[in-house]
């Protein structure tokens, strides 16, 4: 390693190297949540461009490429698209579950009435669009796609808020994140229950046994994350064979992840004081007492963080900048035609997102506050909430995912067009309204009271 001799880190900081100038900037880039929305948008544009170009047939065929393994009588063969949708997306759902667990135990969702505000608003944002969709598609071939209009895309919503900067009303970001988390959890359950095949109970029982084993390993104090990932992969195979959509495994494992660190802050302090008690010098190598103490300190520092925090920090960049763009490339490609846009399924999807979402979120949130069931977050005006409610019409990722489970061929193409069109309209409408209203809109607040 080449160290920058001219660089003098401040006391308590790590020494710097020449490569840090590049890697630190890149790490900061990955930490910006809004950036993932921009990358996702870029992948979507690429998919749409290639799907409507002379290379469209080759682009679509790429995602149907069969990939798998065979060991004796065991054979696992899936298309590249299925591996992304069923396999890699499990990591996405795992991250979503980690966020849910963290928010409920450590974050904004600890306050029951604050939780109620997000849950009630999310319920309206799911029930009203679903009801509107079913009203338009009752008795039609697209009726089975009622789950498409339920979710909200967190990355795109946060990306939109980032464009507004300081104009975003206080509390709106937390509210939309909480609402999106509830939306995603409900959408995951819809996929698992509403869009699964006939169930193989033996395979499902094997998956349940695997979950019990993972719980047992946690109680015994097994700390190696690789062991849990291996066990999770085996459970995924069992649940996938059962007929239930295997992405539910990611949710269950995420919710099972502990939120407390193994090493307490007090114990960490004691271990570090022991390391610091040794005299300075080049004596930290070899099988010596001070070297062993240093290794223990390294483990203690890592284990002070909870598994939820460690896994989220480790996996989030891979999911945001790897899994999600791949998902968009594999699923957002759609042939843009006037016939597809005026298809009844496309129109029903657009109505559900563009009209149903904001109406449902706003109306249910208002009812929750009026009945005393929930409290509105401090600093969140009703004008800001309406603008945010319009942004919840950006369904994209989860909507495309559910559409892939509910539809095939031409109907799927129409549903994708509806999702994309609704996402564009909702983002423009939401951003416009949030720009029009100041942070504190007393007039609209008074009207709602």
Swiss-Prot record:
It comes from Acidiphilium cryptum (strain JF-5). It is a multi-pass membrane protein. The keyword Transcription does not apply. GO terms for molecular function: sodium:proton antiporter activity. It is found in: Cell inner membrane. This is Na(+)/H(+) antiporter NhaA 1. Pfam families: Na_H_antiport_1 (PF06965). InterPro entries: Na/H_antiporter_dom_sf (IPR023171), NhaA (IPR004670). The chain crosses the membrane at residues 32-52, 87-107, 114-134, 145-165, 174-194, 202-222, 233-253, 318-338, 347-367, 382-402, 417-437. It comes from the Bacteria. Keywords: Antiport, Cell inner membrane, Cell membrane, Ion transport, Membrane, Plasmid, Sodium, Sodium transport, Transmembrane, Transmembrane helix, Transport.
């Amino acid at each position: 390693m080449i160290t920058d001799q001219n660089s003098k880190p401040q006391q308590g900081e790590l020494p710097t190297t020449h490569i840090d100038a590049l890697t630190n900037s890149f790490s900061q880039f990955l930490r910006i949540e809004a950036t993932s929305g921009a990358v996702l948008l870029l992948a979507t544009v690429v998919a749409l461009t290639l799907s409507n170009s002379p290379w469209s047939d080759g682009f679509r065929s790429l995602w149907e490429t069969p990939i798998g393994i065979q060991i004796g009588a065991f054979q696992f063969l899936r298309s590249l698209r299925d591996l992304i949708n069923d396999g890699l997306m499990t990591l996405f759902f795992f991250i979503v579950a980690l966020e849910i667990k963290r928010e409920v135990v450590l974050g904004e969702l600890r306050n029951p009435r604050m939780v109620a505000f997000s849950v009630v608003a999310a319920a309206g944002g799911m029930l009203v669009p679903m009801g509107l969709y079913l009203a338009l598609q009752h008795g039609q071939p697209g009726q089975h796609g009622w789950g498409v209009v339920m979710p909200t895309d967190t990355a795109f919503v946060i990306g939109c808020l980032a464009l507004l900067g300081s104009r975003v009303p206080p509390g709106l970001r937390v509210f939309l994140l909480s609402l999106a988390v509830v939306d995603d959890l409900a959408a995951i359950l819809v996929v698992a229950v509403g869009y699964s095949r006939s169930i193989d109970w033996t395979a499902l029982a094997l998956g349940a046994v695997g979950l019990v084993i993972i719980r047992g390993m946690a109680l015994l104090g097994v700390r190696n994350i690789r062991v849990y990932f291996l066990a999770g992969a085996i459970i995924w195979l069992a649940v996938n064979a059962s007929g239930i959509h295997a992405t539910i495994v990611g949710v269950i494992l995420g919710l099972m992840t502990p939120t407390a660190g193994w090493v307490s802050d007090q114990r960490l302090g004691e271990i570090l004081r022991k390391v610091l008690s040794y005299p300075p010098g080049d004596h930290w190598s070899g099988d010596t007492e001070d070297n062993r103490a240093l290794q223990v300190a390294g483990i203690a520092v890592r284990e002070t963080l909870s598994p939820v925090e460690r896994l989220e920090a480790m996996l989030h960049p891979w999911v945001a900048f790897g899994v999600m763009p791949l998902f968009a490339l594999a699923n957002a490609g759609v042939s843009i035609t006037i016939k597809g846009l005026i298809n009844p399924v496309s129109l029903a999807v657009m109505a559900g997102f563009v009209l149903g979402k904001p109406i449902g979120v706003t109306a249910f949130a208002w009812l929750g506050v009026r009945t005393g069931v929930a409290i509105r977050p401090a600093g969140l005006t009703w004008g800001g909430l309406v603008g945010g409610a319009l942004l919840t019409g950006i369904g994209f990722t989860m909507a495309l995912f559910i559409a892939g489970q509910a539809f095939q061929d031409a109907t799927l193409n129409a549903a994708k067009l509806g999702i994309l069109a609704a996402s564009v309209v909702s983002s423009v409408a939401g951003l416009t309204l949030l720009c029009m209203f100041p942070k504190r809109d007393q007039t609209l607040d008074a009207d709602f009271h």
